[in-house]
A protein has these predicted regions:
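Nucleic-acid endonuclease domains
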Residues: 1-79, 84-180
Length: 180
């Protein structure tokens, strides 16, 4: 018999055991206050992102109004705003990229707000509709639409998605663009 043994009762003294019990070894969000939001359905999560943004800018003293139609989510300081949120994806227990989806340049909005959530924070970014549209609608040298969301890259469905980090997108600037 080996002299190097961990008895069953002593496994409780090891941090990795607690990590496994609480899924921290495979889920960076396991002890995050953002986890309940991450686990919501897409529709509910989207509504949460909209309400969080409205409440956040209201705390800044900005004016929030109801949308004029279903093509935008809210009006902030008189500007029509569409809101997109993403949690950092987890692959093999590691945090990877963000993915913002359902970007539709044909809709009636002036600005797009992007929420970037990871286990410890939620950051807000903002871009003009024109900047976002110019970026996502590009056609590459092979005739593909690299940001197209539906139907593959060879077609232009009018709905786009972007993967990466805010620093990867020149249009993701300060939320202060909406400040009057």
């Amino acid at each position: 018999m080996s002299k190097h043994i961990i008895q069953e009762d002593y496994i409780l003294n090891y941090m990795i055991y607690d990590d496994v019990l609480n899924n921290r070894d495979i889920d960076p969000y396991s002890d995050s206050k953002f986890r309940p939001i991450k686990n919501m359905t897409s529709k509910r999560k989207g509504r949460f992102f909209e309400q969080l943004t409205e409440e956040y800018v209201d705390h800044l003293g900005w004016k929030v109004s109801k949308p004029e139609n279903s093509d935008h989510d809210t009006i902030i300081n008189g500007k029509k705003v569409e809101i997109k949120g993403s949690f950092r994806w987890v692959v093999d227990g590691q945090l990877t990229h963000y993915r913002w989806q359902q970007i539709r340049p044909s809709q009636d909005y002036e600005y797009m707000v992007f929420l970037a959530l990871d286990p410890r924070k939620c950051e807000f970014y903002c871009g003009t509709k024109q900047e976002v549209s110019d970026f996502v609608t590009i056609q590459d040298s092979n005739g593909n639409y690299p940001y197209n969301q539906h139907g593959g890259m060879t077609m232009n469905s009018g709905t786009y998605r972007i993967d990466g980090f805010p620093k990867d997108f020149p249009f993701m600037k300060s939320l202060d663009q909406l400040a009057v």
